[in-house]
């Protein structure tokens, strides 16, 4: 969150969006990437910032007193009351010598996050991002598991974090972690934040599981084969993946190798900076008024062309058909990797310039199965 304004990918997109819309989207975008920058009029979509300013900081969240709805920056900031600084938070017994304090139930609810994690197209009302709605309609909401319960813990699966919220504060049974772990491995790596990149990877790896549904009992050269896979969203309280659709992609990279390790079949490789045609991926794709795919220019989108993302606690199956080459020798190993990136490298190059930022591929899960040969021609190697 601290990188929300300095994110060069976002800044590149914002500059393009501002130019294309004659500045009409500037305040909408800036409002959720640096509320302080918006309210002080100290930043510019074109990069001419008046001061160096952070993205989402302490004052932004703890000045929020209410929301006017969901999405598009629908927050209300009350940094002062009766001429005194005021901070809101989840404790009804909080005190501070530096400012007044007020209890806010909103800070414990997903509705707090909804103010920016639903995004609606400002011109045609297209639902561009619906992370909050995805959670609201999920079993997690029914079980009273809030966004904060996953993204404000020390690591996946840790529900209690005892300690002090401030140096002079009392010991608490649970203190919310303010690392705000998400899935942006690429940005953390770009900024040299290796620890945060590792946290992001752990969160991704806790989100999904993969299993074989069917594999051949045996194989031989020249034989047809089929493989069935299932990917289950076991840990994300929203669709997998979620967020802006111009880049977020999860996909299966399936490889079959012979006894030497040489590939005899593959589908799901990255070629020319994007996943190859036919790849089983999980992604939302937007389109313009003519039905053309919108790669990253969200301001041109007016429809959702497809959405293959996996629902919370849902699953998606994939089936593969292939033929083993006639000169291949077994045994054969089938390996499936479940990968994620925030942007395809080819898209990233168009936004920030070629080879400026490397799009990190995060391996979320991997499974493999060895298939023996099925005839007497096989040799033990």
Q: Which role does the model predict for each range below?
A:
Residues 26, 31-43:
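Conserved, well-structured interaction surfaces
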Residues 2-17, 44-300, 306-312, 319-324, ...:
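Primarily the internal scaffold of c-type cytochrome electron-transfer domains
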Residues 330-334:
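Exposed beta-strand face motif in extracellular beta-rich ectodomains
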Residues 23:
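Local sequence-structure signature of Cys/Sec-based thiol-disulfide redox active-site neighborhoods
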């Amino acid at each position: 969150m601290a990188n929300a304004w300095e994110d060069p990918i976002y800044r590149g997109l914002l500059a393009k969006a501002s130019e294309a819309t004659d500045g009409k989207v500037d305040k909408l975008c800036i409002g959720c990437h640096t509320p302080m920058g918006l309210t002080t009029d100290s930043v510019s979509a074109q990069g001419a910032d008046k001061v160096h300013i952070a993205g989402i900081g302490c004052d932004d969240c703890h000045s929020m007193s209410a929301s006017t709805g969901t999405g598009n920056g629908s927050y209300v900031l009350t940094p002062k009351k009766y001429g005194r600084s005021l901070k809101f938070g989840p404790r009804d017994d909080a005190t501070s010598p530096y400012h007044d304090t007020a209890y806010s139930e909103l800070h414990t609810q997903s509705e707090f996050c909804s103010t920016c994690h639903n995004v609606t197209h400002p011109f045609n009302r297209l639902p561009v991002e619906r992370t909050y709605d995805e959670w609201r309609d999920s079993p997690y909401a029914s079980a009273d598991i809030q966004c904060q319960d996953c993204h404000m813990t020390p690591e996946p699966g840790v529900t209690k974090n005892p300690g002090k919220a401030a140096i002079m504060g009392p010991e608490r049974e649970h203190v919310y972690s303010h690392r705000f772990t998400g899935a942006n491995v690429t940005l953390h790596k770009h900024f040299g934040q290796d620890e945060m990149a590792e946290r992001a990877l752990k969160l991704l790896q806790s989100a999904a599981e993969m299993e074989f549904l069917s594999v051949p009992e045996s194989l031989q050269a020249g034989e047809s084969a089929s493989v069935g896979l299932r990917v289950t969203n076991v840990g994300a309280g929203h669709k997998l993946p979620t967020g802006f659709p111009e880049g977020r992609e999860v996909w299966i990279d399936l490889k079959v190798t012979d006894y030497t390790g040489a590939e005899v079949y593959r589908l799901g490789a990255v070629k020319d900076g994007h996943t190859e045609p036919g790849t089983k991926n999980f992604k939302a794709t937007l389109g313009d008024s003519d039905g053309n795919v919108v790669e990253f220019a969200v301001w041109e989108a007016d429809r959702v062309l497809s959405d293959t993302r996996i629902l919370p606690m849902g699953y998606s199956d994939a089936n593969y058909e292939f033929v083993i080459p006639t000169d291949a020798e077994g045994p054969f190993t089938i390996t499936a990797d479940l990968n994620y990136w925030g942007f395809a490298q080819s898209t990233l190059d168009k936004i920030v310039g070629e080879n400026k930022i490397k799009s990190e591929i995060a391996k979320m899960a991997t499974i493999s199965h060895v298939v023996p040969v099925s005839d007497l021609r096989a040799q033990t190697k």
